[in-house]
Swiss-Prot record:
This is Transforming growth factor beta-1 proprotein. Homodimer; disulfide-linked. Interacts with the serine proteases, HTRA1 and HTRA3: the interaction with either inhibits TGFB1-mediated signaling and the HTRA protease activity is required for this inhibition. May interact with THSD4; this interaction may lead to sequestration by FBN1 microfibril assembly and attenuation of TGFB signaling. Interacts with CD109, DPT and ASPN. Interacts with EFEMP2. Interacts with TSKU; the interaction contributes to regulation of the hair cycle. Interacts with TGFBR3. CDD domains: TGF_beta_TGFB1. Keywords: Cleavage on pair of basic residues, Disulfide bond, Extracellular matrix, Glycoprotein, Growth factor, Mitogen, Secreted, Signal. The keyword Glycoprotein applies. Coiled coil: none annotated. It comes from the Eukaryota.
Length: 390
């Protein structure tokens, strides 16, 4: 370029900037986050989910359906799936990023309480203020071979009809037949059964590391200093007098259990190689006509959209996705233009403006078959609940 033109360049640049962008005007038009056709976005999201599910399950391709037994799912599998689904539904999405190990699917296992007929219960004095629940640690270790693989453990029990309000406490069996306090709940009167849940992740990790053959919990009425009657008024399904016939089987299936979520051994070695990070939420975005960054609805039918028949529950789910511009104010009286120029110099392929990305995500429990065996797993970060500009 001739020297005379070089001398004019500093004078022309301010005029060019004024033509392109007036002071205080949103600079969203300069974003390299391209506007994409909605249908194209949905198709790309569906294909991404196809790969995401297979990746989380460590499957190179969808399982064969040739050996799947006909008929409905086994009752035990369906009960485990329902328990997992109910737990997820009861939790709100966390806005913080999940730790690296939470990227891969967790294998969900239900370990039932040792039956009431076991001798361990006969060795404990029967009292009106407490009931006891013991578990076989060999069953726990079979489900989770390494304590470090355990992501979460919950003690779940079904409370039957309750006529009076009662404060209850949970204790862990400790050394020398003593009991260590864990947590408490205030139960209100109800005519319908209700599932109670206690987080016992730390306790189960201890049992997996150095527990005895049988370990247990004590579920007690709160011992109030000013009350003479500390009787436990709560009746727990599966604990109590033996039933006969079909009722005995139902009674046994409904007894308290531990719900374990753990990373399978075959996936543990891959934890270091992948990361997945997780506002504008569904309550706002689904009820407004917001054009900027927001959660957009997307329902995926496993059979229709992915051509999959190997996932038995659920039939589909609301995956959702984030879409919309992220405008910002760019004034000529700021230093932002200098920063942006330097940023683009070092990151020529990056966006010049913030992009709309997921902020909070929730897991998806599924039931699928591997050969003739039905499995329940929880896939993390599958449902977009809120978005942000980043």
């Amino acid at each position: 370029m001739p020297p005379s033109r070089l001398r004019l360049l500093p004078l022309l640049l301010p005029l060019l900037w004024l033509l392109v962008l007036a002071p205080g005007r949103p600079a969203s038009g300069l974003s390299t986050c391209k506007t994409i056709d909605m249908e194209l976005v949905k198709r790309k999201r569906i294909e991404a989910i196809r790969g995401q599910i297979l990746s989380k399950l460590r499957l190179a391709s969808p399982p064969s359906q040739g050996d799947v037994p006909p008929g409905p799912l086994p009752e035990a599998v369906l009960a485990l799936y329902n328990s997992t689904r109910d737990r997820v539904a009861g939790e709100s999405a966390e806005p913080e990023p999940e730790p690296e190990p939470d990227y891969y699917a967790k294998e969900v296992t239900r370990v039932l309480m040792v039956d009431n007929s076991h001798n361990i219960y006969k060795s404990i004095e029967t009292v009106a203020h407490s009931i006891y629940m013991f578990f076989n640690t060999s069953e726990l270790r079979e489900a989770v071979p390494d304590p470090l693989l355990l992501s979460r453990a919950e003690l779940r029990m079904q409370r039957l009809k309750l006529n009076v309000e009662q404060h209850v406490e949970l204790y862990q069996k400790y050394s020398n037949n003593s009991w260590r306090y864990l947590s408490n709940q205030l139960l209100t009167p109800s005519d319908t059964p209700e599932w109670l849940s206690f987080d016992v992740t730390g306790v189960v990790r201890q049992w997996l590391s150095q527990g005895e053959e049988l370990e247990g919990f004590r579920f007690s009425a709160h011992c109030s200093c000013d009350s003479k009657d500390n009787t436990l008024r709560v009746e727990i399904n599966g604990i109590g007098p033996k039933r006969r016939g079909d009722l005995a089987a139902i009674h046994g299936m409904n007894r308290p259990f531990l719900l374990l979520m753990a990373t399978p051994l075959e996936r543990a070695q891959h934890l270091h190689s992948s990361r997945h990070r997780r506002g504008l939420d569904t309550n706002y975005c689904f009820s407004s006509t917001e054009k900027n960054c927001c959660v957009r609805q997307l329902y995926i039918d496993f059979r229709k959209d992915l051509g999959w028949k190997w996932i038995h529950e659920p039939k589909g789910y609301h995956a959702n996705f984030c879409l919309g511009p992220c405008p910002y104010i760019w004034s000529l009286d700021t230093q932002y233009s200098k920063v942006l120029a330097l940023y683009n110099q070092h990151n020529p392929g990056a966006s010049a403006a913030p992009c709309c990305v997921p902020q909070a995500l929730e897991p998806l429990p599924i039931v699928y078959y591997v050969g003739r065996k039905a499995k329940v797993e929880q896939l993390s970060n599958m449902i977009v609940r809120s978005c942000k500009c980043s």
